[in-house]
Amino acid sequence: MADKFDANDETRTVYAVVYDNDQPVSTGQFLAETKIEARLTRIVTLADYCGCGYGAKVTEALETYTRREGFYQLTIHSELTAQTFYENLGYQTYGPKCLEDGEYCQSLAKTILKWEKNMDIAMLIAIVGGLLGCYLYLTKNN
């Protein structure tokens, strides 16, 4: 599993890991993208342990962390072979499929916290600001 780590690992990553005795058999990473959105990445289970539910447990543990920390949405950029796995966990596809490193990939998202009446105005401003930033980025790059 050592090859599943990257530059983000040393600074801002939260992990969930499933062990079989002392061996890590499934893991995943949480990365905060904005104050309201986060990304799950590098969710992997060793081949001998696939089908045991460990990938789902890792994903659910990271979702629990996401909820507790107050994030509203999670995104995942997944190879097509794992798309159904994430859809079964409540993720929905968005955007076009793309080819990366010889593999077709798809972005998926899941709302973790719903907007509630008592949420403060600062959060509303953060959401509107994020949407405006996305609009400006898309306008500039299209």
From Swiss-Prot:
**What is this protein identified as?**
Uncharacterized acetyltransferase SpyM3_1195
What EC number(s) has UniProt assigned to this enzyme?
Answer: 2.3.1.-
Gene3D superfamilies per the record? 3.40.630.30
- Name the family the entry cites: Belongs to the acetyltransferase family.
> Where is the N-acetyltransferase domain positioned along the sequence?
1-120
Check the record and name the InterPro entries matching this protein.
Acyl_CoA_acyltransferase, GNAT_dom
Task: Give the UniProt keywords, A-Z.
Answer: Acyltransferase, Transferase
GO molecular function term, any single one: acyltransferase activity, transferring groups other than amino-acyl groups
Say yes or no: keyword Transferase present.
yes
